[in-house]
Amino acid sequence: MSSSSLLEDLMQALQCLPSVGPKSAQRMVYHLLDKNRKGALNLSSLLERAVNEIGHCQQCRTFTEQNLCAICDNDKRNKNGMICVVEMPVDVLAIEQTALFSGTYFVLMGHLSPLDGVGPEQLGLNLLDKQLSSGQHSEVILATNPTVEGEATAYYIAEMAKRYAIKVSRIAHGVPVGGELEYVDSTTLSHSFSGRSVF
């Protein structure tokens, strides 16, 4: 039995999501149509609203429904003087869930990748440079991913910050909590050794 073109289109559309292949998309579509049509309509409505109403914070570039996100609009966070640079909005969420950081963020929406046509301008580094030159920041915390591109991006931003005599730090990378050394790759292990602390 062949599927209708609308079903096929819907399954294909769902595959734009990360980790969703043909089988997962098929299960989702058949579940929503067979068991949860009300949920499907609610999902459709919320997706449409989100796409139309959620934009980027004018200061840090994370997702928000307002001109400024709740963090940038918080005077206590702004007075802290620390700014944490991350690659994606989901990284802000991950750090916020630790409840350890009380400064502001700057979201790059990617990393430097000249081969893909992603340079400083595409990452909004002119906006970051303007913020750093304002004299309101005492420390830049680099929290880009520990990839070649992430490290290159971190280095580029560190050089920017040093022009304004701002302290620059990099989040530690190493062995995960609960991890076993035999399963840790050599690059991660070398980062762990070079970033070791007194016990």
From Swiss-Prot:
Zinc finger boundaries on the chain: C4-type: 57-72
Gene Ontology molecular function: any one: DNA binding
Domain Toprim: 81-176
InterPro entries in alphabetical order: DNA_Rcmb_RecR (IPR000093), Rcmb_RecR (IPR023627), Rcmb_RecR_Znf (IPR015967), TOPRIM_dom (IPR006171), TOPRIM_RecR (IPR034137)
Pfam families linked: RecR_C, RecR_HhH, RecR_ZnF, Toprim_4
Family annotation (Gene3D superfamilies): 3.40.1360.10, 6.10.250.240, RecR Domain 1 (1.10.8.420)
Keywords assigned by UniProt, alphabetized: DNA damage, DNA recombination, DNA repair, Metal-binding, Zinc, Zinc-finger
Gene Ontology BP term (one): DNA recombination
CDD domains: TOPRIM_recR (cd01025)
Record family assignment: Belongs to the RecR family.
Protein task: May play a role in DNA repair. It seems to be involved in an RecBC-independent recombinational process of DNA repair. It may act with RecF and RecO.
UniProt protein name: Recombination protein RecR
Gene transcribed to yield this protein: recR
